[in-house]
């Protein structure tokens, strides 16, 4: 008879098997714990990143708002201030044929202006509209006391004409403000006389960038010419002049008729 015998595990084998099971369970538990921690940490990092983005955007919004408000304050308090004035004067033209009739009543011609006077910049910008009852041209005029220059822009021709500022004729911006104030209040009788100046365009000016920002803005990209008084030109040939026009304005308590001639 053959006997089949089963070997029963010894105590040592049982102990080794138990240790293997415990080690496997321990590794599994640690893996689950680590996985849970990682899962908990990742949302925290995402939440922290979103919070930082929100704080950054909020800070940028405050900075942008501060720049806008600050810029508005700077523009309001530090930009040059100007006031637009309107006025009208009437003058007696002794050369008008109507006024040469014996026994006739004097006929006064009106001159209207709009002036942008900037005392801080020491400048006066005059707008002479199309006249209603005279043969003069509409024009934009700049009297720049800082640069000592006067610029005429003939709005019909589109050309600029420049000359040294004549302070014996042109009032300072402060005095011009007072003059327009009198005209507006009716304290000044706007019936006055006319002073004539005869000017000739002698040469073209290619670059007006050194004549100040205001004259540059008026005359840039336009044909510009230097003016001289006719009586100061030696050997001047009157027959060489074939085009003349007039601009009437009042830079003072009287009317100035600026006659400009050009070949």
UniProtKB/Swiss-Prot annotation:
Transmembrane portions of the chain: 54-74
Subcellular location: Membrane
Membrane-protein topology: Single-pass type II membrane protein
A GO CC annotation given for this chain: membrane
Pfam families: BRICHOS (PF04089)
S-S bonds: 160-219
Entry comment describing in which tissues the protein is expressed: Expressed in mandibular condyles, in bone and in hair follicles. Strong expression in osteogenic tissues, such as neonatal calvaria, paws, tail and skin.
Transferase among keywords: no
Protein origin, superkingdom: Eukaryota
Keyword Glycoprotein: yes
SMART domains membership: BRICHOS (SM01039)
Main location: membrane
Entry keyword set: Disulfide bond, Glycoprotein, Membrane, Signal-anchor, Transmembrane, Transmembrane helix
Stretches assigned to the BRICHOS domain: 133-227
Family named by the database record: Belongs to the ITM2 family.
Record protein name field: Integral membrane protein 2A
Organism: Mus musculus (Mouse)
Lineage: Eukaryota, Metazoa, Chordata, Craniata, Vertebrata
């Amino acid at each position: 008879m053959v006997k089949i015998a089963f070997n029963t595990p010894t105590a040592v084998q049982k102990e080794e098997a138990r240790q293997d099971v415990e080690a496997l369970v321990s590794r599994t538990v640690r893996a689950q714990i680590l996985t849970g921690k990682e899962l908990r940490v990742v949302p925290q990092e995402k939440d922290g990143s979103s919070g930082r983005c929100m704080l950054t955007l909020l800070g940028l919004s405050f900075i942008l708002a501060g720049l806008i408000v600050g810029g508005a304050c700077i523009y309001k308090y530090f930009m040059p201030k100007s006031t637009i004035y309107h006025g009208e004067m009437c003058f007696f033209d002794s050369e008008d044929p109507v006024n040469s009739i014996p026994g006739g009543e004097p006929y006064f011609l009106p001159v209207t202006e709009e002036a942008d006077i900037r005392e801080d910049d020491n400048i006066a910008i005059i707008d002479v509209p199309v006249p209603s009852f005279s043969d003069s041209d509409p024009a934009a005029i700049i009297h720049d006391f800082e640069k000592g220059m006067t610029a005429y822009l003939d709005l019909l021709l589109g050309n600029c004409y420049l000359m040294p500022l004549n302070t014996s004729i042109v009032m300072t911006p402060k005095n011009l403000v007072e003059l327009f104030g009198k005209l507006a209040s009716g304290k000044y009788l706007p019936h006055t006389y006319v002073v004539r100046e005869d000017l000739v365009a002698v040469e073209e000016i290619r670059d007006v960038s050194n004549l100040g920002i205001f004259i540059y803005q008026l005359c840039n990209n336009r044909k510009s010419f230097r003016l001289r008084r006719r009586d100061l030109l030696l050997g001047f040939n009157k027959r060489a002049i074939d085009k003349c026009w007039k601009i009437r304005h009042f830079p003072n308590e009287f009317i100035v008729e600026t006659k400009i001639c050009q070949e």
